[in-house]
A protein has these predicted regions:
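Conserved AdoMet/S-adenosylmethionine-binding subsite of the radical SAM
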Residues: 1-174
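A cross-taxonomic marker for long C-terminal extensions/tails that follow the last structured domain
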Residues: 161-197
């Protein structure tokens, strides 16, 4: 079990941010000086600063990262971050207030992302998100080992599939196929689609 110090270190927004509001003060300075600002976070705390955003929203885009609609999967990969429901609510609140919003969907993972991806895309369109950015799992030395450990511990029935995709040469085939499926599904939708791969 992780120590409380480790848990705090892994939170999207540190407890100190709530007290000192450093991000809020930086955001205010950027927007007051007409600096184009893009915020990407996993935290619904971003809505705390909506009053500042509304003063100069023309130079601002705000995005939240979501890897899946499934809270069980989310807890395994992002145990200390806000729930998917809280993130979607934040995106909706920002969009409803005229802030340009986007969603970073990544890293996309077999089954974890796939099973709820199409529903997630529809939900994001309905709440007014203007752009979806998709990214693959960047397999680096040691990272796929860590990923396989998480899968083995939490989803042993998926271990063989993940081993095949991330160590057995199916990596690019999987992501190329998924990219084509996403492009087909998103054709005619009201948002821009961007891929990081």
């Amino acid at each position: 079990m992780a120590s409380s110090r480790a848990k705090q270190r892994n939170r999207s927004i540190q407890p100190i941010e709530r007290k000192y509001q450093l991000t809020r003060r930086i955001l205010e300075k950027l927007l007051n000086n007409n600096v184009k600002t893009i915020i990407l976070t996993k935290s619904n705390l971003v809505t705390r600063d909506i009053d500042i955003m509304l003063e100069n929203s023309r130079n601002l885009q705000v995005g939240l990262t979501i890897i899946t609609l499934d809270e069980h999967f989310k807890r395994a990969f992002e145990p200390y971050s806000p729930s998917v429901k809280e993130r979607l609510s934040a995106l909706e609140k920002l969009s409803r207030n005229g802030i340009v919003t986007f969603c970073f969907i990544g890293p996309m993972l077999p089954v974890v992302t796939d099973e709820s991806l199409w529903t997630l895309i529809d939900v994001l369109e309905n709440i007014g998100v203007k752009m979806l950015i998709f990214d693959r799992m960047n397999v680096k030395w040691g990272l796929n080992k860590h990923l396989l450990e998480i899968i083995g511990k939490n989803f042993p029935d998926l271990y063989e599939l993940y081993e095949k995709v991330f160590t057995g040469g199916e990596y690019w085939k999987y992501y190329k196929s998924l990219k084509n499926d996403i492009l087909n599904f998103c054709e005619g939708k009201s948002f821009k689609v961007v891929f990081c791969y």
